[in-house]
Amino acid sequence: MRNPNSAAANAAGVVSRPRRALSASGVAGLAGLGLAHVAVAAEADAAAPVATAPATAETNEVAGVSINAKRVADPSSSKFTAPLVDTPKSVTVIPSKIIEQTAATSLTDILRTSPGITFGAGEGGQPLADRPFIRGSSSGNNIFVDGVRDSGGQTREIFNLEQVEVVKGPDSAYSGRGSGGGSINLSSKTPKAESFARGSVGVGTDEYIRATADLNHAFNDNVAVRVNVLGTQGNTPGRKAVDFSRWGVAPSLAVGLNGDTQLTLSYYHLDTDQTPDYGIPLTTKTTQPRTASGILAVDRRSFYGIESRDYQKTKSDIATFAIDHAISDDLNVRQVVRYSKSLNDYIVTNPGDGGAAQFVQGQWWMKRGTKTRWNPTKTIAAVSDIHGKKTFLGLENSFDVGIELSREENLNATYSTFTTSGSACPTGFTIAAATLTSLGAGDCTLVYAPNDKDAWTGVINRSPAARNVAKTAAIYGFDTIKFSDKLLLNLGLRHDSYDSAGVDVATTQANGVFTSVTYTPRKGSWEFTNYQAGLVYKPTESSSLYVSYGTSSTPPGISGGDQNSNTSTGTGNLATSQLIPEDSESFEAGAKANVFNNTLALSGAVFKTTRQNAQILVGPGANDYAQVGEVEVKGFELGFSGNLTPKWQVFGGYTYMDSELVRGAITISNGTVVANVNQGDPLANTPKHSFSSFSTYRVTRAISLGGGAYYVSKSFGGNQGGAGGGANKIYAPSYWRYDAFASWTISPKVDLQLNVQNLTDERYIARTNGVHHADPAPGRQAILTFNVKY
């Protein structure tokens, strides 16, 4: 895997440079550090007298209802002014226990347990990063860490997560600007007023190794420090030459844990180095008979990249200062200040972007194309709020009022990748003149037997970077008004002042050298106000019925689904006009309940979401653009979480989504206006049916068995606003996936866990952009994890 360093990024000439792999000894070293600490502490713990107190049961809030558990899983945000069972909105909290038992390591793994969420493919102007779709809308720009927006396209890790919280439906009252589908909050681990240590070492097939340590030391009742450490590496199961290496550290300090004022300092660092993978080609790139899905029937392991050139390196650093002060028993103030930076840097082979495949000398050949990005971001954010409970006009009010200020800066550049010497194209293979100028000759590979070991020498230069600075100033308020024990009113309001300014860059290049650069300054300012309102009726103390309404605003650029774009103007006659934000609104009605003596949480909701004001072509002229595009998603979802019996745990749900491109851009054929070929089709990355269930059963005091079952129906390829798989009707076929789980508690401090992911080695497509490529999901993998704790 090659990686040009920053000093040489603008210098011509390439030398193959292997990536920095985190060696097995390095991972083992991290494991040894963590486990040695655990072992020493456990020995000291056994030798020293310890004061103990009876364990107390706490209440989990999962999918909006309470279940008995050892760890609280309430959303961490004070914007939730009522328990989730009394919150009139679809909210799912995925607790640490589910994260651990499923052996999740990424955001994709975690969100698999929550039906109705899919992931979009890179390309089409989108970064190679986490791109979750919630209820038909790209929500990559709506990912938060501890309530503060986590800007930039990234691939996230879970080693420092306590839980993941998913809000579904338009929620700009909660989160500000967004795509209308919902938001995801990653809740970090924080210091506790008790000392403990946990260490894990996992080994598995496909050269998988992972070591983590979670060390918490309480100096006294008020001061504690916690450190989480990660080292991992391996290969992607079922994919040739796709490997990864990651390491991270997350220290935090808390002062005043049991006092009226608590101060928390935390830092998070993650470093990744991996082979990027754009999957397999589509049949549209050949004249072969089309498969039903439009995805070429090649071996699942087929990898079209070049091991010596392709790379992806990401970095993430987050420093946070937070202070909470209890003015009284019913009133608290909070201040959070965050500085973060990230980098997403890659060169990836796109198997369908170098031109159509050609049948030459009795075999199918293709010329490789590339997608590249160099995208550093910096964010400074501050959030202040006051929350509590007061009686006004004889009614109990639980409220949260706050302000939010942020400045987000990102640079976005690309690399030239001009081949001077590479795998030869066969005699008779034709290359377009423009492709010869931009990519060079050679760099061909067989469609049905690609060779990732092909040599490559060429010119890599980084282009001048586009720059954007987005500033947000917002004020918000939430209130839950208690009219009686049976009737509650939940209200939310947020007003945003959002400014975006920057410079766009257009370049031309020949033979890998950028020959001209055009800079175009732009800026835009928007004011938008969003609301939410919900009425809750409680038949019993542990159940609720509700109806709710919510809105969302999506500024231009973000409406395209790109985490890093803030375009302000449009196309054609809208090129000199500031576009208005797209607006989303949602109606929802649902029910939540605790059953079986509050050990099982059940929830259900019906919803309808509409997004309007997308820019589309409406007439035959070049200036016939208008913001009248519209999409709609309606459906229902069911959720369950908790215990069917004291030994049987379940977590999962089912989502049905009936999505539609209500009005899309017209097309022009021989001067005649033709309706959008996909109008009326289902939206991209929005399967009609999705189901997930993860369940474990304690067979004996020491042995637990279980597993997961996941179903996703046919899902069309494309990006935000796309539908029906585009003109080529490309889709990812439906699939069932099964996982297996087993654990053995050797002692109260030691256990073994076995996970077999994709148990039947199901060959399925995780996502497709509908234009160039489709991404196969990982194949079967077995992981054995050794856990120690005290």
Q: PLM features: residue spans?
A:
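Acidic, small-polar-rich N-terminal luminal/periplasmic segments of exported/outer-membrane proteins
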Residues: 61-194, 589
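Structural signature of Gram-negative outer-membrane beta-barrels, strongest in the C-terminal barrel
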Residues: 254-258, 377, 396-408, 466-609, ...
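Membrane-embedded beta-barrel scaffold of Gram-negative outer-membrane proteins
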Residues: 324-338, 342-348, 545-546, 578-665, ...
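Outer-membrane beta-barrel translocator/receptor signature
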Residues: 159-162, 173-249, 257-261, 317, ...
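C-terminal beta-signal and adjacent terminal beta-strands/loops
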Residues: 2-4, 711-721, 743-790
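Acidic/polar loop-and-plug regions of large Gram-negative outer-membrane beta-barrel proteins
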Residues: 232-237, 249-256, 260-326, 342-377, ...
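N-terminal Sec signal peptide and the immediately downstream disordered periplasmic leader
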Residues: 1-102, 108-114, 382, 671
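Gram-negative outer-membrane beta-barrel transporters
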Residues: 599-600, 608-610, 627-721, 760, ...
